[in-house]
Amino acid sequence: FVATSKEAKEAMELAEMVYEGDISLQTVSFCRMEAQQECLAGSFCIPKLLDVQGSRYRILFFINQRHIVIIDDNDFSWRLIMRIRQNRTKQGETREHFIYNFIGQFMSRDVETLGRYESLIMDMEEKVMDGVIEGFQNEIMPIRKELLTLRGYYDQLMDMGKELEENENGFFAKKRLKYFGIIA
């Protein structure tokens, strides 16, 4: 199920999802997982790669024995799912595989982005080696801030992967926990 905040209550009921808490995308400020008695609840706070320090995609998701509910007020999750459908012959016939593909889709452009940072830093290093140091600090500081932001985000995703792999609620098949190990 993919729903907006307004549709969340209905989607949760249809999926027989019991969540003890408020469902609010406005409170999403980082990536995390929480095991509850009846479901796993998680959030994604994904930096927009063209503006790492700016606004983010905010998504809530809930997993129980049979279903996944994704709450997203933008069309970001729908676009990810459409890309999964276009690019994957095995789109996610299990919840574990779907979660792996979903996270993989929003991380798919990260390597390219990190490569751009690497090129920028290498160009700056060459200038410094050539004795051109004017403006170096002003150029490097925003890059450093963006890389620190991305590092925090990736640390959160790794923690989330570990929590999924721990399978505290026993919602996932042991043989499929390997998908979460790849994320971690």
Tell me the role of every PLM-derived stretch.
Residues 1-182:
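Peripheral, non-transmembrane regulatory/ligand-interaction domains of membrane transport proteins
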